Protein backbone atom coordinates (compact mmCIF):
# COMPACT_ATOMS: atom_id res chain seq x y z
CA UNK A 1 0.00 0.00 0.00
CA UNK A 2 1.24 3.53 -0.81
CA UNK A 3 2.20 5.35 2.40
CA UNK A 4 2.29 8.73 0.65
CA UNK A 5 -1.47 9.00 0.16
CA UNK A 6 -2.77 12.54 0.66
CA UNK A 7 -5.30 12.51 3.49
CA UNK A 8 -7.54 15.28 2.14
CA UNK A 9 -11.06 15.41 3.46
CA UNK A 10 -13.56 13.73 1.14
CA UNK A 11 -15.89 16.28 -0.44
CA UNK A 12 -19.40 16.93 0.84
CA UNK A 13 -22.04 14.76 -0.77
CA UNK A 14 -19.62 11.92 -1.56
CA UNK A 15 -21.18 8.48 -1.17
CA UNK A 16 -20.58 4.81 -1.79
CA UNK A 17 -23.20 2.19 -2.57
CA UNK A 18 -23.31 -0.94 -0.46
CA UNK A 19 -25.38 -3.87 -1.76
CA UNK A 20 -26.30 -7.18 -0.15
CA UNK A 21 -27.38 -10.29 -2.07
CA UNK A 22 -27.74 -14.06 -1.78
CA UNK A 23 -29.49 -13.76 1.57
CA UNK A 24 -27.01 -11.32 3.17
CA UNK A 25 -29.70 -8.64 2.89
CA UNK A 26 -31.73 -10.42 5.59
CA UNK A 27 -29.07 -9.30 8.08
CA UNK A 28 -29.74 -5.69 7.07
CA UNK A 29 -33.50 -5.51 7.46
CA UNK A 30 -34.16 -7.03 4.05
CA UNK A 31 -32.85 -3.89 2.31
CA UNK A 32 -30.61 -4.85 -0.60
CA UNK A 33 -28.99 -1.49 -1.34
CA UNK A 34 -27.80 1.33 0.90
CA UNK A 35 -26.17 4.63 -0.05
CA UNK A 36 -23.55 5.41 2.59
CA UNK A 37 -22.24 8.98 3.00
CA UNK A 38 -18.51 9.64 3.20
CA UNK A 39 -18.92 13.37 3.92
CA UNK A 40 -16.14 14.95 5.88
CA UNK A 41 -14.21 11.69 6.16
CA UNK A 42 -10.52 11.33 5.69
CA UNK A 43 -9.20 8.10 4.20
CA UNK A 44 -11.69 5.36 5.00
CA UNK A 45 -10.58 1.73 4.86
CA UNK A 46 -13.04 -1.02 4.02
CA UNK A 47 -12.37 -2.42 7.51
CA UNK A 48 -13.72 0.82 9.03
CA UNK A 49 -16.78 0.63 6.80
CA UNK A 50 -17.45 -2.92 8.03
CA UNK A 51 -17.56 -1.63 11.61
CA UNK A 52 -19.82 1.24 10.51
CA UNK A 53 -22.19 -1.21 8.81
CA UNK A 54 -22.26 -3.34 11.98
CA UNK A 55 -22.97 -0.34 14.21
CA UNK A 56 -25.43 1.52 11.96
CA UNK A 57 -27.22 -0.81 9.51
CA UNK A 58 -26.95 -4.40 10.74
CA UNK A 59 -30.23 -5.66 12.21
CA UNK A 60 -29.35 -9.37 12.36
CA UNK A 61 -26.77 -11.31 14.34
CA UNK A 62 -23.36 -9.65 13.81
CA UNK A 63 -21.67 -13.07 14.00
CA UNK A 64 -23.44 -14.08 10.78
CA UNK A 65 -21.79 -11.18 8.92
CA UNK A 66 -18.48 -10.48 10.66
CA UNK A 67 -15.73 -12.56 12.17
CA UNK A 68 -13.17 -10.47 14.04
CA UNK A 69 -12.36 -7.50 11.75
CA UNK A 70 -13.47 -9.02 8.45
CA UNK A 71 -16.47 -10.69 6.82
CA UNK A 72 -17.23 -14.29 7.67
CA UNK A 73 -16.12 -17.05 5.33
CA UNK A 74 -18.93 -17.70 2.87
CA UNK A 75 -19.55 -14.04 2.07
CA UNK A 76 -18.08 -12.95 -1.25
CA UNK A 77 -17.09 -9.27 -1.39
CA UNK A 78 -16.87 -7.41 -4.69
CA UNK A 79 -15.46 -3.89 -5.02
CA UNK A 80 -16.60 -2.28 -8.27
CA UNK A 81 -17.16 -5.76 -9.77
CA UNK A 82 -13.68 -6.98 -8.73
CA UNK A 83 -13.03 -9.61 -6.05
CA UNK A 84 -11.78 -7.85 -2.96
CA UNK A 85 -8.86 -10.30 -2.74
CA UNK A 86 -7.38 -8.38 -5.68
CA UNK A 87 -8.12 -4.98 -4.10
CA UNK A 88 -6.46 -5.38 -0.70
CA UNK A 89 -9.47 -6.77 1.22
CA UNK A 90 -10.02 -4.77 4.43
CA UNK A 91 -7.09 -2.45 3.59
CA UNK A 92 -8.86 -1.15 0.47
CA UNK A 93 -9.26 2.64 0.60
CA UNK A 94 -12.84 3.59 -0.22
CA UNK A 95 -13.36 6.09 -3.03
CA UNK A 96 -16.45 8.23 -3.67
CA UNK A 97 -18.75 6.34 -6.03
CA UNK A 98 -17.49 2.87 -5.09
CA UNK A 99 -19.95 -0.03 -5.26
CA UNK A 100 -19.36 -2.67 -2.58
CA UNK A 101 -21.33 -5.91 -3.00
CA UNK A 102 -21.66 -8.60 -0.33
CA UNK A 103 -22.98 -11.95 -1.61
CA UNK A 104 -23.74 -14.77 0.79
CA UNK A 105 -22.68 -18.08 -0.74
CA UNK A 106 -24.13 -20.10 2.14
CA UNK A 107 -27.54 -21.60 1.45
CA UNK A 108 -29.78 -23.79 3.52
CA UNK A 109 -30.88 -27.16 2.28
UniProtKB/Swiss-Prot annotation:
One GO biological-process annotation of the entry reads: tRNA wobble uridine modification
The opening ranks of the lineage are: Eukaryota, Metazoa, Ecdysozoa, Arthropoda, Hexapoda
Cited Gene3D superfamilies:
3.10.20.30
What species does this protein belong to? Aedes aegypti
The pathway this protein participates in, as annotated, is:
tRNA modification; 5-methoxycarbonylmethyl-2-thiouridine-tRNA biosynthesis
Question: What protein family is recorded?
Answer: Belongs to the URM1 family.
- Report the subcellular localization: Cytoplasm
Modification after translation is described as: C-terminal thiocarboxylation occurs in 2 steps, it is first acyl-adenylated (-COAMP) via the hesA/moeB/thiF part of the MOCS3 homolog, then thiocarboxylated (-COSH) via the rhodanese domain of the MOCS3 homolog.
Question: What is a single cellular component term in the Gene Ontology annotation?
Answer: cytosol
Q: List the disulfide bonds.
A: none
Q: Say where the cross-link Glycyl lysine isopeptide (Gly-Lys) (interchain with K-? in acceptor proteins) occurs.
A: 109
- Check the record and name the HAMAP family matching this protein: Urm1 (MF_03048)
The identity of this protein, by name, is Ubiquitin-related modifier 1 homolog
As stated in the Swiss-Prot or TrEMBL entry, residues carrying the post-translational modification 1-thioglycine are 109
Q: Write the record's keywords in alphabetical order, separated by commas.
A: Cytoplasm, Isopeptide bond, tRNA processing, Ubl conjugation pathway
Job description of the protein: Acts as a sulfur carrier required for 2-thiolation of mcm(5)S(2)U at tRNA wobble positions of cytosolic tRNA(Lys), tRNA(Glu) and tRNA(Gln). Serves as sulfur donor in tRNA 2-thiolation reaction by being thiocarboxylated (-COSH) at its C-terminus by MOCS3. The sulfur is then transferred to tRNA to form 2-thiolation of mcm(5)S(2)U. Also acts as a ubiquitin-like protein (UBL) that is covalently conjugated via an isopeptide bond to lysine residues of target proteins.
Cited SUPFAM superfamilies: MoaD/ThiS (SSF54285)
